[in-house]
Structure formats: C-alpha cells, structure tokens
UniProtKB/Swiss-Prot annotation:
It comes from Homo sapiens (Human). Residues 5-129 form the PX domain. It is found in: Cytoplasm; Cell projection, Podosome. This is SH3 and PX domain-containing protein 2B. GO terms for cellular component: anchoring junction; cell projection; cytoplasm; podosome.
Length: 911
C-alpha cells in the first residue's frame, strides 16, 4: 500500500460567492500534495472553525489548554463580524489571516499537520470538483428569500427556546437573545455569532425577525428519493419510524434539520441527517472540518467534530422542544470516514406550541450588570499574532476561544492574549448607569483638564505598583460599600472641593499603606465612572447648592472638623483620587455593592475606582474619612479599626470625614484616654474616673458638668481642650492606645457621664494624627508639641461642651479654644453651629446606599437639646454618614421612632 500523501503547501487565493442553499462565501484554497498534484478546494469559515475545534480537542497540550505558553496550534482568525457588516467584507478581511493560519497549520510537527483531521479537511471532495449549480430548491413558504438581495448582510434571528450547549463547538442560547446567522445548514445546525462567541446551534431554537421560515415545499414532480442511512424510532405522533436502507420521498425540506417525508403511504417528519440522496452521501448534522465547503443538502460527507458521541448519545430533552428527541445510537455506517465520536445527531424538534412569527420574545433585559474587561497584569506576548499590554487597561473582547486565549482589542491594537490575564467587572446598572460609562477618547482628554492629577495617579499607580501577575492572588479592594453611582460621578469634584474646602473633612482618607501601593490599579475604573467634564461641573454646582442648603437640615451635633491634620494632606491626593490602597492584609472580593464584581480577587488599586476616595490612612489608622457620604464599604473594615464600638461602623463606613476624628477610634481612644488622660491631665482624678470618654469629655469632675470638666482639664494643663486632645492623643491615638482600640466597653461608662459625645470631643485622635500629619487646613494652629494649643479647629472634637450640652460644648469648646480655652460661652455655641454646617456641607449626602445599613447601639447615650438619647441595643438605619463623626439615623427598634444625629462611635454594624 503506497504511503499516504502529505500536504506540501497551502495557499488561500480568494473568496467566492455561492448561492445554494443560501447566499454565502467560500475560500478558494490551492493545495499542493507530496505526490506533486495541485488541487483547488472550497471551504467556508465554519469548516475552519470545526477543524480548529477538533484540533484543540485532540491536542489539548499543543492547544495551550493546560499551559498557554506551550501552545503551538495557530489561532484561527476570530469572528470579525463588525456588527452588521456585509458578508463579503467580513470574508475578505479574513482572507490573509486564514491564509496564514493554513500555512502555520501545515508547518506543525507531522503528528499534527499530517493527522487525519487535517488531511481530510484539505482533501478534494466532489463538491470541490463540481460546485453546486445556481438553482432554487423550491420556494420559501413565506417572505421570499430575503438573503438574495445584495448587499449580503448577516441575518439576525431571535432565540425562541433556551438551549444548553453539549459540545465545545456549540454555544448556549437564551430566550430573547439575538444572534447573527453566519451559515444555515440543512442538517438543522446553524453557525451563528453572538456578541462574544460563535458556534453551532439548533435552528429549531431560532426564528427570523422578519417571520421568514426557511421552509421549502416541493412540488410533486420535484419530490426526491432519499435512502435512510440510520434507523430512527419516532418519538412523537407526527414523526416516522425509519429502517436502515428504506427509500423515502422527501416532500418538504427546510434548514431546521427535520423534513417531511412520505413512506409506505404515510407522511411524517424525519431527521434530515438520517437521510441521504440516492445518488449522494449522508447529510452531516453540522458541517465539519472534513466536510465539503458547500453547506446544505449537498454538504454531504463532512465529519463534524460536533457529532461527538459521548454525551451526545443522549439528546437533551428540552421542554421547549417537547422533548421529542433523545440520544440516537451511534450509526454504524460511514464508520471508516468518521471517528467513533463523530456521529450525526438531529437538532431538537421545534416547539410547535410556540406560534411562528408572532410575538417574538424580546431580547432579555440587559442583565443588571454590564460587563467590562480589564487586564489584571502585565503580559509580553511571544507569538506573532499576540498582543502585549500593561495591567489596568480596558479591553474589548472580540472572541473568547476555548483554548484559553482570547482575541482582544486595546485601543487600536488587537491580538491574542491569555484569558487568565483578563478579568471581568460587572457594573451594577441603575438609574445612574451613565456614571459607569467609559468616556470616549476625546472625553478622556477633557476629563484630564480637571483631574490630571487623578488620571496621573491612576496610571501612575498602574505603572508604579508592581502589577500582580495572575489573578490568583486575591487583592483587597477598598471601596465604598454603597453604590458609587451617586458619588462616583461627582467624586472628583468632591475631592477637589474637599481639599480646597475643608481639606480634611470632605476629603477621603487615602489609604496609604505602602503595601497597597504595590497592587496594580485599574485606571479605567475611574474613567468608566466619570462620564464627562460637564457632568463633573454639574456635580460641583450641585454640591455647592447642597452645601448652601444643607444648613437647614439637621446638622451633626458637634461637627468635628477635620481634626486630623495629617489627614489633610491626603486631600490633595484626594483631589487626584489616589487609588485607595487597602492594606495588603485586607483581601476581599469585590462586591456588587461596589458596582464591581469579579471572579478573582482584585486589589483596590487594581480596581482604582474613583469611588474609593482615597482615604489616606493616618498613621494611627484613623477612621476612614467619610467621603461625601460615600457609601461605606461593607467589606472594608473601616480602618477606623478597632475603635471600641465604633470599629464596627468603620467597617461599613467608607472613609469617614476627617472631621470624624476617628469617632470610632474616639470611643476607644476616649477610654484609653482615660488612663492616659490622667497622666496627661496632670492626674485629674475625676477625669481619670471619667475614664472612657475622658479623652473627649475628660471625665467631668464631680461637681462640674461635662463641659466644665473639659474646661478645667484644659485649663489645668494650660491647654485648650484641643490641645488636650492633642496630648491625649496617646490615649486616643490608635497606635498610642491600643487598649482603647481593644476596649469597646468605654461606651457603657461613658453613657453614665454622657459619653461625651465623642464625635465632638474626639479631637484626640486627630491630635495623634496631627503629629503625624499636618492638620488639614485646620482653622486653628495645630497643637504643637502637644503643648502648644491646638488652634481650635472648628471640628475638633475637643470642645468642652457647655456643661449641659456636651455636643454643643464640644464644638464650642473647639472654637472657644481658639479664643481661649475657657470660653464656652454661647458664642461657642454659635460657632458650633458653623462647624456643623461646614461639616455637614463637607459631608456628601449619601442617602442612596445607606438605606440598607443597619447599626446597633453599643452603649447607652444621653442626649441633649440637639440630640436624642438611646439605649444600648437600639437598632438604627443610617441615612447619612457625616465626616464629622455624627451620623443621621432613624430608630428602627428599641425606642419610639425618631430621626436625628447620633455619634457614630456608639454604633456598630448590625450582624
């Protein structure tokens, strides 16, 4: 037996138009064999697709399924459908890539290039020698042949029944989905393309948008004789039992795989793939790589890899398809040409209960999420048609190949890239969806005008931070837990304003963990959130209006202006929106709340959302400053860290306003402050007793009101309350006072003394931070050396409340300090109001995301004229989180229903 000939050369010459059974294009290929002969063959793109699928199934290692770097099988040019492009344009654009594919294929090692599948694909078939004649098989039942009109544009069909793919070359369908038809085959299997993939699907699950049914009724004289090649047992009353070898008359054909036949005087339906024309070959269920280029009834002997027997033996009984078909036994005929798994299988029957052409299902409502793809690590390609990229770039996925490689486009470049370097973010869609739309290139340049810093920061982080190689390692993502839709858009303005206004109060603390910086950030996230500069300006104006109008709304009792000096520095960064850097130790998956959702864990930096208002992390881990009420991140444990009780809130709260002064921490600080206070306060006994809240309230001396205690303390030390807090820092300072962090109890004692409205008095934390960072544009001088008086920053929590009203006194105290430690006069009160207003203005109303935030009181709180009292265990719904440390809440249980401002350090996230 002479040795089998091998392929020497393959050249794709051109494309040719065919009209039978419907309009399509085939590639003209010249094949030179080792025997010296040169032959011309014609193949459709779908045949190449089938060959590729067969190759990848047969040679998984060489196809890069296990290790993309070991792939040697060339990539089949992706689906270049260009939406509704003319078919010829698509075919021509694929011409050179298909030629390169063929050349690369035959240059592979012999065990691949000379394997049966490849040789069969390039062998000449009867249809190559005698191309189909231009004749109509019959006339369509309705609508006429819409595809006969030039220019040829891909037809679109609507999915009327769900279908779950059963082979790698197939794709799954969902009712209402719209697909582009690339090839209609009489086997009943059509080659289609969706937004992201292409493959074979049963035609019975589709219906033309124009009502055309692709059915041909044959006139009596046109009826053709066919021979049954596989036995078939009817599964429905209108089907026919077939015996191998029987000759039947086909009276009605269609492209859905089921033909009406007449046998022994009876009429019924039979699978077209079980029949063969008396003079022809069996019709394959789906054109395969080895099948002839001509699709349709003449597409007779291709072996489609789609016909894998395993798992195909059983046909999925689809309710929509009436479950009329089941697995057929593997045909024993045609065995020599087909591998055991390559067998024919009819598509499911069409569900006749669904009226044809009427009320086609509407496309599914776009999922609640829109998908965007980004590169998660740097990649340098080693293949000619690959693409190299950096981490954090937005990607347009043109084709998802089962091999693990995706054909992508980044800006104006495209090529193959390993799917493991690309991840998907799902953007929660809502009324503000536009906020998530990525700006167009020209919009990006505009955006840069107002946020050059932000962009710089984003890209910088991407370049600077060592990008994480693969998505394996989860990265913590810092985000505001609430939907960013509202603030994101304006986050830039907010940040800008924040830095300019109260640098610290509105600013977001930027997490500046060096560790976090290492994580790659995804700049695109920011762009995708901010739609346009105009929008930003509009936001800015809106915010300004809000600030002005905000006065009337209940103000946080004693807004603590950004006491933390250092925090303020971040504001500048805030304006750039430095990417929030989560602690390395914090790894968690993005959540939908954030508007993101990804399969692998990503670093906050990677996500780089504008949302994350950079929260600069104070050395002491001050509570995150709350961005304009940016939704807190539920996942993000507020860095406020372990404040006694506040800690929980930090968890959800997004960065708290610097004003907040770590209210959460406050609590802890207060407590610790107690002990430290003693030392700091020169041993004021009562204050020591005051304990927990001492830091802020400096426990009141026995005979004094809370306000007084502070005054006295301040006076004794010769420091203004603020200064005291500065000194107190040790206690409040998270770092200084670990104990405070750990001790959540303070609140309980505090309640007795009136926890000193921590938010106002909490300056201490700031103090601590102040030492580490410059006070954010603090109105008053920072405490210098702890001894210098801290200029009363309006928001500093240290104000000594007028004896009776701790909150007011606090704020007053802070301001009084400015004037003089002891001035707690009514004047202070007025100032407090100002502070509140400022803080309120600084805080961004964040009602949207807070509605579902439930918090529980961790201690009893005694209110004053501006605030209400509540008991430990009371459940609140947080409506707004103010950077001052005061949150506007509504009581849900444990007390009569009321709304008002309460200190956040008395709350913790409800489990």
């Amino acid at each position: 037996m002479p040795p089998r000939r091998s392929i020497v050369e393959v050249k794709v010459l051109d494309v040719q138009k065919r009209r039978v059974p419907n309009k399509h294009y085939v590639y003209i290929i010249r094949v030179t064999w080792s025997s010296g002969s040169t032959e011309a063959i014609y193949r459709r793109y779908s045949k190449f697709f089938d060959l590729q699928m067969q190759m990848l199934d047969k040679f998984p290692m060489e196809g890069g399924q296990k290790d993309p770097k070991q792939r040697i099988i060339p990539f089949l040019p992706g689906k270049i459908l260009f939406r509704r492009s003319h078919i010829r344009d698509v075919a021509v654009k694929r011409l050179i890539p298909i030629d390169e594919y063929c050349k690369a294929l035959i240059q592979l090692p012999p065990y691949i290039s000379q394997c049966d599948e490849v040789l069969q694909f390039f062998e000449t078939r009867p249809e190559d020698l005698n191309p189909p004649k231009e004749e109509h098989i019959g006339k369509k039942k309705s609508g006429g042949d819409q595809t006969s009109v030039d220019p040829m544009v891909l037809e679109q069909y609507v999915v009327v029944a769900n279908y779950q793919k059963q082979e790698s070359s197939e794709i799954s369908l969902s009712v209402g989905q719209v697909v582009d038809i690339i090839e209609k085959n009489e086997s009943g299997w059509w080659f289609v393309s969706t937004a992201e993939e292409q493959g074979w699907v049963p035609a019975t699950c589709l219906e033309g948008q124009d009502g055309v049914q692709d059915e041909f009724s044959l006139q009596p004289e046109e009826e053709e004789k066919y021979t049954v090649i596989y036995p078939y047992t009817a599964r429905d009353q209108d089907e026919m039992n077939l015996e191998r070898g029987a000759v039947v008359e086909v009276i009605q054909k269609n492209l859905e795989g089921w033909w009406k036949i007449r046998y022994q005087g009876k009429e019924g339906w039979a699978p077209a793939s079980y029949l063969k024309k008396n003079s022809g070959e069996p019709l394959p269920p789906k054109p395969g790589p080895g099948s002839p280029s001509h699709p349709g009834a003449l597409d007779l002997d291709g072996v489609s890899r789609q016909q894998n027997a395993v798992g195909r033996e059983k046909e999925l009984l689809s309710s929509q398809r009436d479950g009329r078909f089941e697995g057929r036994p593997v045909p024993d005929g045609d065995a020599k040409q087909r591998s055991p798994k390559m067998r024919q299988r009819p598509p499911p029957r069409r569900d006749m209960t669904i009226p044809r052409g009427l009320n086609l299902p509407k496309p599914p409502i776009p999922p609640q999420v829109e998908e965007e793809y980004y590169t998660i690590a740097e990649f340098q390609t080693t293949i000619p048609d690959g693409i190299s990229f950096q981490a954090g770039l937005k990607v347009e996925v043109i084709e998802k190949n089962l091999s693990g490689w995706w054909y992508i486009q980044i800006e104006d470049k495209e090529g193959w890239a390993p799917a493991t370097f690309i991840d998907k973010y799902k953007k929660t869609s809502n009324a503000s969806r536009p906020n998530f739309l990525a700006p167009l290139p020209h919009e990006v340049t505009q955006l840069r005008l107002g946020e050059a810093a932000a962009l710089e920061n984003n890209t910088g982080s991407e370049a600077t931070g060592p990008s994480r190689p693969l998505p394996d390692a989860p990265h913590g993502v810092m985000d505001s837990g609430l939907p960013w839709s509202k603030d994101w858009k304006g986050s830039k303005d907010v940040l800008r304003k924040a830095s300019s206004d109260m640098s610290a109060s509105a600013g977001y603390e930027e997490i500046s963990d060096p560790d976090m910086e290492e994580k790659p950030s995804l700049p695109p996230r920011k762009e995708s959130i901010i739609k346009s500069e105009g929008e930003l300006l509009e936001r800015e104006r809106e915010r300004q209006r809000t600030e002005q109008l905000r006065g009337p709304t209940p103000k946080p009792p004693g807004v603590i202006l950004p006491m933390m000096p250092a925090k303020h520095i971040p504001p500048a960064r805030d304006s750039r929106r430095p990417e929030p850097k989560p602690d390395k130790s914090r790894l968690f998956q993005l959540k939908n709340d954030m508007g993101l959702e990804c399969g692998h864990k990503v670093l906050a930096k990677e996500v780089k959302k504008p949302n994350l208002r950079p929260i600069s992390k104070s050395k002491t881990d001050l509570p995150e400053e709350k961005p304009d009420a940016t939704p807190q991140n539920p996942f993000l444990k507020s860095r406020p860290q372990v404040r006694p009780k506040p800690a929980p809130s930090p968890k959800t709260e997004p960065p708290q306003g610097e004003d907040q002064v770590d209210i959460c921490n406050l609590r802890s600080k207060l407590r610790p402050a107690k002990s430290q206070d003693k030392s700091l306060l020169d041993g004021e006994g009562p204050q020591a007793v005051g304990g927990q809240d001492v830091a802020f309230s400096r426990s009141f001396l026995p005979g004094e009101g809370p306000g007084r205690a502070q005054d006295r303390t301040g006076k004794q030390d010769g420091l203004s309350p603020k200064e005291i807090s500065c000194r107190a820092p040790p206690r409040p300072a998270k770092t200084t006072d670990p104990v405070s962090k750990s001790v959540p109890v303070p609140l309980q004692e505090a309640p007795q003394q009136r926890p000193v409205v921590p938010p106002r008095r909490p300056p201490p934390p700031k103090k601590t931070s102040s030492s580490s960072r410059p006070l954010p544009e603090v109105r008053g001088p920072q405490c210098e050396g702890h001894e210098s008086r801290a200029a009363p920053t309006p928001g500093r929590a240290l104000l000594v409340p007028p004896k009776a009203k701790p909150f007011l006194s606090n704020s007053l105290g802070g301001q009084d300090d400015t004037r003089g430690k002891g001035s707690l006069g009514p004047w202070g009160t007025g100032k407090i109001g100002e502070n509140r207003e400022k803080a309120a203005a600084a805080s961004v109303p964040n009602a949207d995301g807070l509605k579902d935030s439930l918090y529980v009181a961790v201690a009893d709180f005694e209110g004053d004229k501006d605030t209400s009292s509540f008991q430990e265990g009371t459940v609140f719904e947080v409506r707004e989180k103010n950077s001052s440390g005061w949150w506007f809440c509504q009581v849900l249980s444990g007390a009569p229903s009321w709304e008002g401002w309460i200190p956040s350090n008395y709350l913790r996230k409800k489990p």
